[in-house]
Amino acid sequence: MAQEVREIRVLSVVDNIGNGGAGRAAYRIHLGVNAVAQGGRSKMFVKAGRAQEDIATLAEFLPKGRWFAAFDWVVSKIKNKIQHAVWRPYKKTQDKSFKSDLRGTWLNGALQKQEYDVLHLHWINKRFIRIEDLPKDKPIVWTLHDSWPFCGTCHYFLDCKGYQHECGSCPQLGSTNPNDLSRRVWKEKKRVFDQLDLHIVSPSRWLADCARQSSLFAGRDIRVIPNCLDTDVFRPFSKAEIVEFAEHQQNAVVSRVLREATQEKGLAKPLILYGAANAASDRIKGFASLLSALQILDKQGFEANLVVFGASETDLPLNFEHISVTFVGFVSDVNLLVWLYNAADVMVVPSLTENLSCAIMEALSCGTPICCFNIGGNGDMVEHQVNGYLAREKDCTDLAHGIQECITHSAEWGAAARESVVKKYAVDVVAKQYSNLYKELAR
């Protein structure tokens, strides 16, 4: 008689599933694990959002009534003042990731009320989880969406190697003090992590190597499992399908962009796509590099249409002679995003650091080649001159050349792009890897 397989209960924790790459990635993994049904059952626990059968929210576990709202407001104000005092010596940074409010004090109780065998952490900052509240009697999987888990205070360490030691004198804090905030937070993480059964997952080989070299995670169980996406949603469409969609699109700007992109060969300018959420304020997004590359192309008389989503014209000053610029604003509709990917001849992702970019994966799955710098996890997804172009790091001239190369080989490289994503990043492929990990840890 076959032995009954016990279902492994997984609680996946992320601050939200609606905004940001980490939330989208976490939700896709959650859905995938439940879909493949290989002995694992995932439930999500989020800070903000709407409660569903498989999604619990922190609000469900907070005290109800006006007294709590008022008390929470007062305590938050006090804690914010303390937080500002902590950060005041470090004027160079605007990072507020270590703020916490009264809600954090209810989290431990909320976690204890959940039934699970494995706790799966994703992105837990923004006043959500205090590491000292993590359970010491359960295996914890922590998927790295940036470097904060193994750094003192930094989400992106850039050229700093302090995380390989004990942090301190943090360049991102503008500090020369070896016992600065980054060192103090590092010590607290070290104290807590030594009590936890941590298993680290990195979506990219690059970040996994960084984690292995870090003083906080050295010697830990560190594995590489990529993020995933629904390749049935993010898929290529024919030119005729794009034209039909454009005719029924209520957004006049998007409709025009799609119609222009599908004109007969010789009439349509190549379409360069750029996603620019927070690009003006976040230098990590690499907008300065993109601007330099486009200026190089413009001086060469290169004609193209640049389509920007996620930012407005007032956010990004773009003015060229030969390259027209269209802003389509913030795109919350996934289907609309898919059509934009399909219309593009190339998507440019000029970020200065990347783990495993959702935008790159989504565009590749739609059959759109990528031009990006050869940094971080980009090389895991983009194969140079096969499904995109890996420009030399910080070399804007090479980035400009890569944009031209992607446009020239758009059809050929786009087909290879789609094939690579289906093979490595489809939901069932990735979910099975996580299901096997859960089973291993829950024995």
Regions inferred by a protein language model and the residue ranges of each:
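Conserved acidic donor-binding segment of nucleotide-sugar-dependent glycosyltransferases
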Residues: H384-Q385, Y389-C396, Q404-S410
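A short, well-ordered alpha-helix in the C-terminal region of glycosyltransferases
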Residues: A411-K424, V430-N436
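Nucleotide-activated donor-binding/catalytic signature segment of Leloir-type glycosyltransferases, i.e.
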Residues: G310, D315-N335
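Conserved donor-binding/catalytic core segment of Leloir-type glycosyltransferases
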Residues: A252-R256, A261-K285, L291-L294
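Short alpha-helical donor nucleotide-sugar binding micro-motif in glycosyltransferases
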Residues: W339-A344
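Short hydrophobic beta-strand element within catalytic cores of glycosyltransferases
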Residues: V349, P369-C372, V382
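Carbohydrate-associated surface elements
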Residues: W206, C228
